[in-house]
Amino acid sequence: MTGGSGAVAGGVSGGTATVALSLASAAIWGTSDFVGGIAARRLPSSAVVTLSHSLSLAMLVSLALLHRSTWPDTPSVIYGALAGLACGTGVMVLYKALSLGGMGLTAAVSGVLAAVLPVLWAFVTEGLPRVPQIAGIVLAAVAIWMIGRAPGSPSSKQAILLGAAAGGSFGCLFILLKLAGRGGVLWPLAWSRLASATLAVIVTWIATRRAGGVKRDATPMLSWPGWPVLGLIAIAGIFDASGNTFYTIATRLGRLDIAAVLSSLYPASTILLAAVLLKERTTRSQAAGMALALVAVVLISA
């Protein structure tokens, strides 16, 4: 293991900002997933990602130009593009799961796996954090499972595979955004969005061909979704890109494991929005998980 006490000290520096930005990214990502999941009930998930990520790409490029951000080095561009592929894969799988009417086991598996991968990476590359932070990370992982897992969720092989695919993709995304962020924020994120949008276009094209082309009565792949759905897609794209921005800044200021674990609490805001707007019932396990998440945040911030 590398880093030792120096890594621990580095984790304390900027710790408050890292916690705040990571929690903000979790809230924003959860909102994006909620809105995107609703849109994915009207359009294929790949089409939702194509439109939302294309819009957010334009937003990121515009912000980078207005901010006169420095062009990133080659490694940051490569890491950013790889992060985009991971993001595009994870979001399409997650939107597909959400469009089926609930998160259940898929959300629980994806949330925990998304947090575990960057935590292990950080332990190797940055050294162990302080004891209270380790305890907070463990509690946060348990909270993520409790929040995402709902009683009665089908424990099918498909649910587990979808959860593992989404979680593995998001875990890689967390690591790659940390690496890409060394060369800046906006331009690496723009490259990430370009890669994810391109991947979604390819997936949409393949799915359309398999469906027999663009036929009004056969596939909704490229049909007009209506302004309300487009509005939801726009919100999903803007919020997702904003969450990526906050998370990347958080990793620049503090430890990867702390940023990733706290950001992985995104299902909480999705469930809260579903409870308020869709009147979906929050279980006792989910409520306990949210309370446990608060304890984890306190320990991590200590």
Residue positions per predicted region:
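Membrane-interface interhelical linkers
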Residues: T2-A27, V35-G36, A40-S46, L51-A81, ...
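Hydrophobic/aromatic positions within or immediately flanking transmembrane alpha-helices
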Residues: S22, S46-T50, G80, G104-A108, ...
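Residue positions within transmembrane alpha-helices of multi-pass solute transporters
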Residues: A27, T31, S62, T89, ...
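Hydrophobic/aromatic residues within transmembrane alpha-helices
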Residues: A39, V48, A97, F123-P129, ...
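Alpha-helical transmembrane segments of compact multi-pass small-molecule transporters, enriched
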Residues: S54-L60, V109-F123, A195-L199, G243-F246, ...
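Hydrophobic transmembrane alpha-helices of multi-pass small-molecule transport proteins
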Residues: L55, L60, V116-L120, P129-R149, ...
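Alpha-helical transmembrane segments and their membrane-interface exit regions
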Residues: L85-G90, V138-R149, A195-V203, P267-I271
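Selected transmembrane alpha-helices and immediately adjacent juxtamembrane segments
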Residues: Q158-L186, P228-V229
